[in-house]
């Protein structure tokens, strides 16, 4: 979840070049080329994005519970129209083994309405609502990651915690809470990704810091990643096939959204930040194929946060596809 947009002059173009420090190499997936696709009219502020093994894309929207689907070679269609408890569709995560599409429905930019924040799951087979779980009062989900066993992990952005729902459980519980994952702005814990079966990475949207958490330990330990600079509103994150951490830098104040790459995120010491793309309009979420093809949603929602600019709705919204640079597996 992240909510920033740049000025028209900073529009991201596919011609933007990529400068990488050696030894990063281009992704080897011959079917993944730099491209973009425009969402259909009325599909505003994309956020959640997931991709099935057959190439089907699912996209959720920040201010609507609609979930769109695009099958290979087909037009965009409405997969799920939303519901009373699904009024936003952020952070989509696909569990193909169990036939579920998980999503986050936070009461963000609610327009004066007060609604409980929910985490929900859709049945992939028919687009129906499988379950919708209300979070406790005051808690708001941000991003989601799925474990191999079907466990659902959610970043709770207001209090700075990691929530967990194991298979068979009826409600989320707090796995870990730390004031370092909160932020004065109210948007703290954001992007989350499992690095392995012991460590996860989590971003603090408000402070610009990244952390690792030993989430399977009886007493999980939170460790700040050493970075050469703060990241301006780190949002969605993903793990590349070579183990590199891909971070979307939302850039609310500067309006300069970027796609970043951090090699060897589990290593100790100072980490290097590589800029894969810049000049984007608030990149918020992504999904990465096993071959290293990334699909990124660009929300273009910053105008909603700037007084006097609320009515300046962009005329189109896009998703971007790009091959990630890969090194030997880390």
Spans of features found by a protein language model:
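A short helix->beta-strand "capping" segment at the edge of beta-propeller domains
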Residues: 27-44
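Asp-box/WD-like beta-propeller blade repeats and closely related beta-sheet repeat scaffolds
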Residues: 114-149, 155
